[in-house]
């Protein structure tokens, strides 16, 4: 076989049973990672063996993912900035540091949520979307706040560049 000028040193392909006896045999102990959506409670979300095969822990994982999505929406809303406005008026440097800290927490929580979604569990995906919807309704669409706050959120929407 022409190897394009590369000499493989007389290497032959491994025997069929070689993978099970060494070399690639170490991969046998690795767990399978889904690369497509699957449905069911037997999964791992964020941590090894969590929630595992226990239905109650799976429900807790779904509640946790839902809460993460709501938190991301809250921290991305103008309501989070409004909470820090009094501090920023009294001490601009401290206000700036507080806003940077809130931004850092928001990005960290968003990354954690993204990692949870990488479990490719359909239930995790659905509760993450539901959490974002609930957070948007609560903090940006007027469910929690008057019409003036909704108008302010629309003017300063990060999606509108």
UniProtKB/Swiss-Prot annotation:
Membrane spanning stretches: 55-75, 109-129
Cellular component per GO, a single term: plasma membrane
GO aspect biological process, one term: copper ion transport
Molecular-function GO terms, alphabetical: copper ion transmembrane transporter activity; sugar transmembrane transporter activity
Organism domain of life: Eukaryota
Major site of localization recorded for this protein: membrane
Keyword Transmembrane helix assigned: yes
Disulfide bridge partners, by residue number: none
Membrane topology: Multi-pass membrane protein
Subcellular location(s) per record: Cell membrane
Mutant lacking the gene: phenotype: Reduced copper transport ability, increase in copper content of the xylem, and enhanced resistance against X.oryzae pv. oryzae (Xoo) PXO99.
Keywords: Cell membrane, Copper, Copper transport, Ion transport, Membrane, Plant defense, Transmembrane, Transmembrane helix, Transport
InterPro entries per UniProt: Cop_transporter
One Pfam family, short name: Ctr
Function: Involved in the transport of copper, in cooperation with SWEET11 and COPT2. Contributes to the removal of copper (Cu) from xylem, and thus to the sensitivity toward bacterial pathogens such as X.oryzae pv. oryzae (Xoo).
Family per record: Belongs to the copper transporter (Ctr) (TC 1.A.56) family. SLC31A subfamily.
Quaternary structure annotation from Swiss-Prot or TrEMBL: Self-interacts. Interacts with SWEET11 and COPT2.
Record protein name field: Copper transporter 1
Protein species of origin: Oryza sativa subsp. japonica (Rice)
């Amino acid at each position: 076989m022409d190897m394009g000028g590369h000499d493989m040193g007389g290497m032959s392909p491994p025997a069929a049973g070689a993978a099970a006896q060494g070399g690639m045999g170490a991969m046998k102990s690795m767990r399978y990672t889904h690369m497509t959506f699957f449905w069911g409670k037997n999964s791992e979300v964020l941590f090894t063996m969590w929630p595992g095969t226990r239905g109650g822990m799976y429900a807790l994982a779904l509640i946790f993912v839902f809460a993460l999505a709501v938190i991301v929406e809250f921290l991305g809303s103008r309501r989070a900035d409004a909470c820090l406005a009094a501090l920023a008026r009294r001490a601009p440097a401290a206000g700036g540091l507080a806003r940077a800290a809130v931004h850092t927490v928001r990005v960290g929580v968003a990354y954690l949520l993204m990692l949870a979604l990488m479990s490719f569990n359909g239930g995790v995906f659905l509760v993450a979307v539901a959490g974002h919807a609930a957070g948007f309704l609560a903090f940006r669409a007027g469910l929690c706040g008057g019409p003036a706050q909704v108008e302010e959120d629309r003017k300063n929407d990060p999606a509108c560049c």
